[in-house]
Amino acid sequence: MNVLFAVWELDPFFKFGGLGDVARALPGSLKTLGVDIRVIVPYYKVVKMGRHKKAKVGKFQIDYAGKKATVEIWEVVHPYKQFTAYFLKNAKYFDKIVGIDTWGFFGKAVVEIIKQNVLNWQPDIIHVNDSHCGLIPLLVKTYALPVKTMLTIHNLAHQGKAPID
């Protein structure tokens, strides 16, 4: 089974709260059970790669907010749990950690990776975490992609509410 684990933080590269711990531990545990799990996360300016070996494994374009945007994909093997992590890089949308466009852009980029088969790997399930990744299931359905989605809400207090505009 192939699982793509979409999340907005991943310990030890960037950790804001408990979700970063979950993003490190759960994929590692599933990998030991034989699941081909890969984590996908924004490559914020504040991400600390340190001495971890990273490789640029892809570059693609998406349409977002009426404009073309380029996204780079950087791959790292998680130093503790040995699963593959993909970091999506785009200076305009991922320089800031918090922003409504950050999450919309991230969701669109994740779905375009699958739609365009950028990684030459397709998930059976996308496990999305919290409101940050909440658009992904809707976009999967909109594009009729042959992928199941699962949403985990880790903290109901953070619902991602924002103005409609």
Q: Which positions does each model-derived feature cover?
A:
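Catalytic cores of nucleotide-sugar-dependent glycosyltransferases that transfer UDP/GDP/TDP-activated
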Residues: 1-165
